[in-house]
Design a protein with these regions (language model features):
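Positively charged
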Residues: 1-156
Length: 156
């Protein structure tokens, strides 16, 4: 079911709780909500749809991957960038890693481990930050538009 996007910074600033098997529907709601916002974002965290659970969805090009209880287990090649967020206005400066390795559980409860790099790694890091309540005050910049080629606006 498509859910409304939460823009309450106080709510988004609170850490999420571990997901359980009972939270499968939240993953499906994230799929539906990301699909409905496809033109504006490439990833989401459950708190963005009002659920404080450790669940994210990340667009990996041709597929959207839902991750339950994702944890970054390794990272390398730090860089600075600016990102947008569907829950916040404007863009913000942040630090990311070019390459990460993330562990998570899939819809079947099977543990997965995946190496990500570039844009996909950036999206994943952004969404995992949401789970811990990390919010950086946005810097307003006029006429910011989502552009997958410039890779500046995460959206979620």
């Amino acid at each position: 079911m498509v859910k409304q996007i939460v823009r309450d910074v106080f709510f988004l600033g609170q850490p999420s709780e571990p997901a359980t098997k009972a939270d499968i529907q939240v993953g499906k709601d994230l799929q539906d909500t990301l699909q409905a916002n496809r033109e504006r974002c490439v990833g989401m965290a459950a708190n963005m749809i009002g659920v404080k659970k450790n669940i994210i969805i990340v667009n990996m090009g041709f597929i959207d991957v839902v991750m339950f209880n994702p944890v970054i287990v390794s990272k390398r090649d730090m860089y600075e960038t600016e990102e947008g967020c569907l829950s916040l206005d404007g863009v913000r400066k942040t630090t990311r890693y070019q390459e990460i390795e993330v562990e998570y559980y899939d819809f079947n409860g099977k543990k997965q481990r995946q190496k990500l790099s570039g844009w996909t790694a950036q999206i994943c890091q952004h969404e995992i930050d949401h789970l811990s309540g990390k919010i950086i005050s946005p810097k307003r910049i006029a006429n910011i538009r989502f552009d997958r080629t410039k890779k500046t606006n995460i959206g979620g």
